[in-house]
Amino acid sequence: MIRRKQHIINLIRQKVNEIDNTAEVILYGSRARGDNKHDSDWDVMILLNKKNVDKKVEQTFRHHLLDIELEIGVPISVFVYSKSDWEGKYSVTPLFRSIKKEGILIP
């Protein structure tokens, strides 16, 4: 099971790198905590080193990860933000605190 998890994490990182190899990728939620169920989704935060990250950019990443979703049979929930916005205006949100506490950086 651990090998499968690592395989999926590697696939996610590889797909993100195909779009932006400088992006930070963070796994969070039940998969990061280790209390997931078999059908739990994969929660992924992608932080970009660019100022403007719009819905089109986020959709690009979502579509790029779709092949993995189809392969594993569970959703990959993706948030994409600029790193500066995430560490600035979003730093007061419960999601920020949760990801800071439990998130795992995918190298």
PLM region descriptions:
Residues M1-E24, A32-G34, H38, N49-P107:
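Catalytic core of pol beta-like nucleotidyltransferases
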